[in-house]
Amino acid sequence: MSDPTIRPQSELTPGDFTAAENPFALFAEWLAEANKSEPNDPNAMALATVDPDGLPDVRMVLMKGYDEHGFVFYSHIASQKGRELAANPKAALLFHWKSLRRQIRIRGTVTPVTDTEADAYFATRPKQAQIGAWASKQSQPLESRFAFEQAIAKVTARHLIGDVPRPPGWSGWRITPSRIEFWHDRPFRLHDRIEFRRDTPDHPWTKTRLYP
């Protein structure tokens, strides 16, 4: 049985997205459509980093903001991704929207967000998620689930009243893209692909159409 959330190829209309000149504007259009069609987390993206031995790591994270300066996500600074980004501040992202038969690939350099940005976003999180950020030692060995629940209980007891401040080891990163590629599924694997490249954030984008 086919998935009713996935648009059949016969209903796909490629539009004229290959005529776009601003990749951020096109990203905003595609994300808006994904917000309507994706059943879960349209802002989910695969984040790829590299360890000191050159081996890649990839995991799903949630994009929590974007503008023409880049794409933002948050996590623990001492996590595996945080350590790898500190050693090699370059990353790749992938958005895949199955319901739309589209994907966007992004490569770029990574910089930490400001404390002001991190504080502002942390304040919007549910209190239980804020407590979890204090209780978790992300990517470190965990003796048992019970040990984690004990840590959560201790943090909860400390913050029964009032706001929960942002942990000093929890913050965010911004990926400033040097390359953004848009891919749209077409019948018989004759897909549409366009790629935007720039040498630095101050340079204009160069657009190229790619073979599928």
Swiss-Prot record:
UniProt keyword list: Flavoprotein, FMN, Oxidoreductase, Pyridoxine biosynthesis
Gene: pdxH
Matches recorded under SUPFAM superfamilies: FMN-binding split barrel
Binding site for FMN: R59, M60, V61, L62, M63, K64, Y74, S75, K81, Q103, Q138, S139, W183, R193
Enzyme Commission number(s) of this protein: 1.4.3.5
HAMAP family attached to this UniProt entry: PdxH
UniProt keyword annotation of Oxidoreductase present: yes
Listed pathway(s): Cofactor metabolism; pyridoxal 5'-phosphate salvage; pyridoxal 5'-phosphate from pyridoxamine 5'-phosphate: step 1/1; Cofactor metabolism; pyridoxal 5'-phosphate salvage; pyridoxal 5'-phosphate from pyridoxine 5'-phosphate: step 1/1
PROSITE patterns linked: PYRIDOX_OXIDASE
Reactions listed under catalytic activity: pyridoxamine 5'-phosphate + O2 + H2O = pyridoxal 5'-phosphate + H2O2 + NH4(+); pyridoxine 5'-phosphate + O2 = pyridoxal 5'-phosphate + H2O2
Cofactor binding annotation: Binds 1 FMN per subunit.
Stretches of the chain forming a coiled coil according to its record: none
GO biological process: pyridoxine biosynthetic process
Binding site for substrate: K64, Y121, R125, R189, L190, H191
A molecular function GO annotation: FMN binding
Family: Belongs to the pyridoxamine 5'-phosphate oxidase family.
Quaternary structure and interacting proteins, as annotated: Homodimer.
Protein name (Swiss-Prot/TrEMBL): Pyridoxine/pyridoxamine 5'-phosphate oxidase
Keyword Membrane: no
